């Protein structure tokens, strides 16, 4: 079945296997093209993917003939090289098998049980497993809320493979139990469960019997059954603060019935051949039992009761989205691939992607397990599900992932390996050539970082972009890079620090400076893509221009700055310290940036000397510019509403005060017939334009290729005078011309100049409107709401930084830059100056035709590469 876009609504069934008992756990070995399914009747079924045949059955715990459920296989996992299979279950044992290579001729698969791991304490059922390959450590979570682990497992197996007789009677099945092993009515006791079979196992297989050391048992690791354990990519270590990093450490996340998801670190104990465990974080509280979980880094997906799925950012430990299935039942299993979420509950499979929710029932009774994987080199992705009716079904979900590029070069196993593209590459050299920079920009543009959108897809994309930038800084050699979480749970701020390593000038009194580069990774929505000539989120290089959403505002200039600094640093030529502050909420007003800067002030730097940014364009297509002034803004909504419902002009017209009439009357008092703004004290702080500034504006009208009708007075009005615009009107009701709406809302946008106080104008505006409304003596109600605001900014175009930039721009373009101001606003600029007590300098990059917030956003490559060259000089000269 397909939707109106031709995208499949659910997957196609590839194959179905049937078994007499429930399928409780599954794991795929894509490279060996094998599937393993753990069953309720103490078996592990092994299937060959190319032929779909059952080629082997592993029987656990009892004789080869007897069917029983005492060793039900509740969880399975494998090593990354697929040479080892691990199982845990109802018998409190972890079993380990060596998996050989299947012979092509007769489908023979060498499977050898090489070890059994047990605990001397009663741990109950084993619900979850993870194998940490680099540490050869198996970790498992249990019914009694304990977390257990055995390190150096392969070494211990090799050492103890012929020694197990003294330990075999300590296994849970061999211990005397006062209840189960008591004398019955006959007065005789029967043989202990599995006594014969375990002896047979010991004699025939030579499997090692390994006891979990008591010091490796974390009692009450949770306060509930530990249902899930997932391991993190070893390079997750890079995301920790430098002081907290442990070389060679591995990490897991455990989740349990207590609702807490805990981050644990496993690391080699220095000087000893042991592994120690540390609890790193226990702040992720789902406030409900976690039945299942999976990781698609950097996100943790927790399946809860009542069909709830919570998505957490592991970097900031913040919840970023919540999904809900239509059927309010436990999310028994969850699988994720490239933001496609497959949630399993008793009603079937629910697929979430881009605000689309599709559901289908595979008719498997109650589905108990799931996994996403791909056949090696097949280029297709499959979903495997196991049901209570004994069925194991394989679904082709490639059509569901039609918007996602699939790679056939590497197998996918979403439960055991992390889906990360080139995110975790090691140290990378930085270059100032366009090809290297294009690779970085191409990655950045591919992230759909629309901060105005609250849908899950954009939210995840914004977080992925932040992680990408953090890793990019680290790969380029940044001394420190981390994400600063926003207090409201919004998009994190990316921080990076490059410590100057070049020689400081020998001039007397010269010292190293600390420069802050501000940028943002969020973008405006692309709108209707039919208005674009190219895909807005795929970088296109055409006719000397970069095209895509964000190339000009602000990802293109950001890449120029990053590569400039990284190149100097890697060459050992970065004279000054440079810090980057890159936010993800600029397009929605930078609401929490101030709190972040104040909280992390000491990390960012107490002694910032200069603030640089490139967040605007030239005034034309030909003349480079330096910007030294921006207007401020107050965007507000004025709402008038009635207690009465929508009315009819024929029945109710003239009977009572109408909200629309009230609103028109009060907003009409905001300006007089000469378009002067009537808010009290509005013009009082304004200063006259200096002769020097007038001459600058005169020069712009003479040199710049702008509208020939534009006068100096037009520039003065747009750049240095305040204004008030009435921008939107919304009302209740159907919009018919005869309907009197019960509520009406008007949007206004007030542009301020640097001399004006935003707080004072807000107070005066509110008081003026309230007094005007009071004079109407209306029975209706008034509400004034400020949506966002920004202070005006005025730099000093004669200071040291502007002079250096003027020199370098002149060298790069063979023409002096125009000194300009703008009528627009950057909400955080004045705030950054005030918090860090440093002057800001605005360096426009693109041309006036960049279409920053419009369709077909573009940036001339020459402008982009020249900015990079300019910055590589400026960062050292300041």
From Swiss-Prot:
It is found in: Cytoplasm; Nucleus. It is an enzyme of class 3 (hydrolase). One of its GO terms (cellular component) is nucleus. GO terms for molecular function: dipeptidase activity; identical protein binding; metal ion binding; metallopeptidase activity; omega peptidase activity; peptidase activity. Keywords: Cytoplasm, Dipeptidase, Hydrolase, Metal-binding, Metalloprotease, Nucleus, Protease, Repeat, WD repeat, Zinc. WD repeats lie at residues 18-57, 68-107, 235-274, 282-322, 362-405, 608-651. InterPro entries: Bact_exopeptidase_dim_dom, Cyt/Met_Dipeptidase, G-protein_beta_WD-40_rep, GSH_degradosome_Dug2, Peptidase_M20, Peptidase_M20_dimer, WD40/YVTN_repeat-like_dom_sf, WD40_repeat_dom_sf. Binds 2 Zn(2+) ions per subunit. Its cofactor is Zn(2+). Zn(2+) 1 binds at residues 553, 587, 853. The active site is at residues 522, 586. Component of the GSH degradosomal complex composed of at least DUG1, DUG2 and DUG3. Belongs to the peptidase M20A family. Present with 1940 molecules/cell in log phase SD medium. Component of the GSH degradosomal complex involved in the degradation of glutathione (GSH) and other peptides containing a gamma-glu-X bond. This is Probable di- and tripeptidase DUG2. It comes from Saccharomyces cerevisiae (strain ATCC 204508 / S288c). The gene is DUG2.
């Amino acid at each position: 079945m397909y939707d109106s876009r031709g995208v499949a609504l659910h997957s196609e069934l590839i194959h179905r296997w049937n078994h007499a008992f429930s399928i409780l756990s599954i794991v795929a070995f894509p490279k060996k093209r094998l599937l393993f399914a753990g069953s309720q009747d103490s078996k592990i079924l092994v299937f060959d993917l190319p032929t779909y045949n059952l080629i082997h059955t592993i029987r656990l715990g009892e004789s080869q003939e007897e069917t029983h459920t005492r060793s039900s296989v509740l969880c399975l996992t494998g090593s990354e090289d697929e040479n080892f299979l691990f199982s845990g279950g109802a018998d409190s044992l972890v079993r380990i098998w060596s998996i050989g290579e299947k012979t092509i001729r007769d489908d023979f698969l060498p499977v050898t049980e090489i070890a059994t791991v047990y605990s001397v304490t009663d741990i109950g059922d084993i619900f979850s497993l993870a194998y940490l390959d680099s540490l050869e450590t198996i970790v498992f979570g249990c019914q009694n809320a304990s977390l257990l682990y055995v390190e150096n497992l392969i070494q211990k197996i090799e050492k103890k493979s012929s020694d197990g007789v003294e330990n075999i009677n300590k296994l849970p099945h061999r211990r005397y139990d006062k209840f189960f092993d008591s004398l019955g009515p006959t007065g005789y006791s029967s043989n202990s469960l599995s006594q014969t079979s375990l002896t047979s196992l010991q004699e025939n297989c030579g499997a090692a019997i390994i006891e979990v050391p008591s010091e490796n048992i974390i009692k009450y690791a949770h306060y509930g059954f530990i249902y899930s354990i997932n391991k993190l990519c070893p390079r997750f270590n890079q995301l920790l603060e430098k002081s907290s990093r442990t070389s060679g450490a591995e990490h897991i996340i455990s989740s349990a019935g207590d609702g807490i998801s805990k981050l644990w670190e496993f690391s080699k104990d220095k000087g000893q051949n042991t592994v120690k465990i540390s609890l790193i974080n226990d702040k992720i509280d789902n406030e409900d039992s976690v039945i299942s979980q999976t990781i698609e880094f950097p996100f943790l997906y927790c399946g809860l009761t009542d069909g709830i799925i919570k998505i957490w950012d592991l970097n900031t430990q913040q919840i970023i989205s919540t999904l809900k299935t239509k059927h309010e039942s436990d999310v028994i299993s969850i699988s994720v691939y490239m933001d496609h979420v497959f949630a399993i509950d008793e009603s079937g499979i629910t697929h979430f992607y881009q605000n689309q929710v599709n559901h289908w029932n595979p008719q498997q009774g109650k589905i108990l397990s799931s996994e996403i994987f791909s056949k090696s080199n097949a280029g297709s992705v499959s979903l495997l599900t196991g049901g209570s009716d004994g069925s194991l079904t394989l679904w082709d979900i490639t059509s569901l992932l039609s918007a996602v590029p699939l790679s056939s070069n590497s197998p996918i196993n979403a439960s055991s390996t992390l889906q990360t593209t080139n995110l975790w590459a090691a140290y990378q050299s930085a270059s100032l050539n366009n090809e290297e920079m294009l690779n970085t920009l191409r990655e950045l543009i591919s992230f759909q970082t629309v901060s105005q959108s609250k849908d899950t897809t954009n939210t995840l994309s914004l977080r992925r972009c932040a992680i990408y930038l953090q890793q990019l800084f680290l790969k380029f050699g940044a001394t420190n890079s981390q994400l600063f979480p926003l207090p409201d749970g919004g998009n994190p701020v990316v921080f990076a620090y490059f410590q100057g390593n070049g020689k400081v000038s020998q001039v007397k009194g010269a010292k190293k400076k600390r420069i802050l580069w501000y940028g943002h990774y969020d973008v405006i929505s692309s709108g209707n893509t039919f208005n674009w000539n190219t895909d807005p989120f795929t970088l296109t290089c055409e006719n000397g221009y970069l095209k895509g959403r964000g190339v000009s505002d602000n990802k293109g200039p950001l890449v120029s700055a990053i590569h400039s600094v990284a190149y100097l640093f890697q060459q050992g030529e970065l004279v000054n310290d440079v810090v980057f502050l890159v936010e993800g909420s600029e397009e929605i007003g930078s609401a929490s940036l101030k709190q972040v800067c104040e909280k992390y002030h000491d990390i960012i730097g107490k002694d910032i000397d200069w603030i640089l940014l490139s967040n605007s364009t030239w005034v034309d297509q030909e003349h480079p510019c330096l910007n030294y002034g921006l207007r401020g803004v107050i965007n507000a909504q004025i709402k008038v509403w009635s207690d009465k419902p929508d009315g009819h002009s024929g029945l109710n017209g003239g009977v009572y005060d109408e909200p629309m009439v009230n609103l028109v009357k009060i907003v009409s008092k905001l300006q007089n017939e000469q378009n002067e703004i009537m808010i009290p004290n509005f013009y009082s702080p304004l200063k006259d334009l200096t002769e020097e500034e007038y001459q600058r504006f005169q020069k712009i009208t003479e040199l710049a290729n702008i509208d020939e009708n534009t006068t100096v007075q037009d520039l003065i009005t747009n750049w240095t005078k305040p204004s008030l615009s009435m921008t939107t009107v919304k009302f209740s009701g159907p919009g018919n011309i005869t309907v009197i709406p019960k509520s009406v809302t008007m949007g206004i946008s007030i542009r301020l100049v640097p001399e004006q106080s935003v707080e004072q104008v807000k107070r005066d505006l509110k008081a003026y409107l309230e007094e005007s409304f009071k004079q109407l003596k209306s029975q209706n109600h008034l509400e004034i709401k400020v949506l966002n605001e920004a202070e005006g900014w005025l730099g000093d175009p004669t200071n040291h930084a502007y002079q250096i930039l003027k020199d370098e721009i002149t060298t790069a373009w063979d023409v002096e830059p125009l000194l300009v101001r703008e009528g627009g606003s950057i909400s955080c600029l004045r705030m950054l100056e005030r918090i860090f007590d440093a002057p800001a300098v605005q360096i426009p990059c693109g041309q006036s035709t960049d279409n920053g917030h419009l369709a077909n956003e573009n940036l001339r490559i020459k402008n982009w590469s020249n900015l990079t060259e300019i910055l590589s000089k400026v960062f050292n000269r300041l």
